[in-house]
């Protein structure tokens, strides 16, 4: 299916925080309670609509183990968005966020949108990290924040789509160079610039209407 833009995402965070389950819930709308550990990198994709435009999200789900960290780093540079995930029932996964964030910012483009996600909100009785702590971390580091549940699908859709909206706004503001695919954005056949001052605004107009995802 044709699209106006393709956005590349990377999902990062400790092992067992629910990264693969979040991806599966978003792409397939199902929860798989027993999930094999990700070895290296897994992939998913889905079409969404923003501002009447078809956007394809290409999502790379990374392994949380230290042994695969070098592989994960190689995917940072080509990402427009990152979902940084911790488990609200495991304090250590929250404590490791600073390391993940430093890694992401060191190896990615400076404009990458980062969404902080506190996953497993359905397990509130086992919560070790208060929501206010997640909000404070996000404020301190300039991140978007949301709590989700891959099991119940709570806020999963919103987390992926709101990240895309942030990226789209940066495109409209001219922050992203959309001609440089290293920024994690690819122009599709539907691309029809609404702002003539945007980089790459000379592209041909695509179809205004298309099928739903």
Swiss-Prot record:
Any one GO MF annotation of this record: GTP binding
Alphabetical keyword list: Autophagy, Cell projection, Cytoplasmic vesicle, ER-Golgi transport, Golgi apparatus, GTP-binding, Hydrolase, Lipoprotein, Lysosome, Magnesium, Membrane, Metal-binding, Nucleotide-binding, Prenylation, Protein transport, Synapse, Transport
PROSITE patterns reported for this sequence: RAB (PS51419)
Residues binding Mg(2+), per UniProt: 20, 38
Membrane-protein topology: Lipid-anchor
Enzyme class: hydrolase
Keyword Nucleotide-binding: yes
Subcellular localization, as worded in the UniProt entry: Vesicle; Cytoplasmic vesicle; Cell projection, Axon; Presynapse
Pfam families, sorted: Ras
PANTHER family linked: DRAB11-RELATED (PTHR47979)
Quaternary structure, from the entry: Interacts (GTP-bound form) with Vps16A and Vps39; the interaction with Vps39 is probably direct.
Protein name per its UniProtKB record: Ras-related protein Rab-2
Gene that this sequence comes from: Rab2
